[in-house]
Amino acid sequence: STIRRVAVNYPELDGMYDNLTIRCQTLEEILADKLISFSATDTHIRHRDLWDIPWIVRAQEIDFSAVAALVAAKHADYRCPASLASMIAVGMQRAHVCYADGSFTGQMQRFLSPAVLDRTHDFDNHCDALNAIVERCYGRVAASLGISDQVEHARRRLATEISSGLISATGMPKRNLVLS
């Protein structure tokens, strides 16, 4: 965590909070949490993380060795059942599918105003760019941890499981619904 001054975003509050500081997470820790939560949750997809991850990376210079160390520590702390390499592979695959199948766009329409969506004239290309950023984030974490080969192996195994129908394209376990 870090201590930061409160940002004054409204002119009418100018001068009221100039000396106020708060303890908050660093952007590296927030990014690590989002990378873990997006790839490790298998009950629902956190589309908002796909918006936040590129925003965090573009907001300022990120120390990816710190992000990687935090991802590894959080993976252990949260007792994630999948290996770290498999979790990263699932995150990459899931991001690709969510950006490509329109589910990300559909979810973002709930959060973004029509004006913001209209400013992004070619949203498909925008999604491709966002996907590249997210994939690069996972890749940099894997490289920092020295597990890039393991992630690539996990990605190939994941592709095989998807093509054989064992899991969905988003890396989610297929669930059998019991109707009564």
Model-predicted regions and their roles:
Residues 1-179:
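Structured mid-to-C-terminal alpha-helical surface segments
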